[in-house]
Amino acid sequence: MKYFLLMLLAIGVTFVHAQTDTTYAERLGFPRGKKVVILHIDDAGMSYDSNKGVMDALTKGVANSVSVMMPCPWVPGMVTFLKEQKGIDAGLHLTLTSEWKDYRWVPLSGKPQVPGLVDSTGSMWTSVEQVVQHASADEVEREITAQVERALGMGFKPTHLDSHMGTLFATSEFLQRYIKVGMQYRIPVMLPGGHNTLIAAQMGADDARLQQVRGVGKMLWAAGFPVLDDLHNESYGWDLPAGKKRDAATIQKEKTAYYIAALQSVKPGLTMMIMHCTAPTEVFPFISDSGTTRHGDLLAMMDPALRSYIQKEGIILTTWRELMERRGKIK
């Protein structure tokens, strides 16, 4: 997601949206001054471990939204779960990269249709930079459309769209196609266009760029879509402090404290917090070395202390489904 604020605006929007005290949360009917949060899990469908973590975090924890990587091998199991657990807020984690060394996936469109999206093995590129170097905007649109169509063909209607590794925010042309596909299917796209306090601090964005980003948010709002006020996207880089035991109890305690601190830093308005809840098996280390932080996300979401904090502070949890319903009622 490091590309988010670097390229978000260059989509041909030239107007500047002056910042006001009214958040998108308020425009959607939430009380003024309240923190309204989506606790969102990325990477569903990537592996058995990812699916198990998602299922536990959504049914036993406080996480309340998820997005699915449609090119990945464990998608059928996740879609079955979503059909059985009706009402879960589930979107698409639009995927244009395959970042792991020995665990790869390929474009749904097929190499002949999107040759710029594949490496010499026929898999998607491992990095965002490689996608930018080799793929055209037409290929990107073709592939993300195929991912939406696969979901719909499986009887899975996504509540929202977002971007794996932020690839769709890497260039203005990619961003245009992301928004275009969302509008064509009337599916909300994840885009923070409000005060952006947290994401600006993370990315080091200046005031001029933030004003431009707010212009994109205004455009999406005018098109009938909900818009985020902010985005928290720093949990993936977390690790246990040096010297701490690496057992489940310690991981849970430390990462719960991390999320409580993160929620304290959230400003009033509508914020999405990104996480990667995973229940790592003995196989997961052969996929990725990120098991500790991913397991920590799961354990934190299931910690009664986190639920208690959210309730005590009066933080409102919402979903993309609710946001679109609220937006549809506003003229």
Functional labels for PLM-detected ranges:
Residues 189, 286-331:
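C-terminal domain-boundary segment and adjacent tail
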Residues 36-38, 63-67, 87-93, 158-162, ...:
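Structural preference for beta-strand elements that scaffold enzyme active sites
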Residues 1-22:
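Bacterial Sec-dependent N-terminal signal peptides
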Residues 48-72:
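A short alpha/beta connector and helix-capping loop motif
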Residues 18-38:
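N-terminal pre-catalytic segment of deacetylase/amide-hydrolase enzymes
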Residues 87-145:
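Substrate-binding cleft of extracellular glycoside hydrolase catalytic domains
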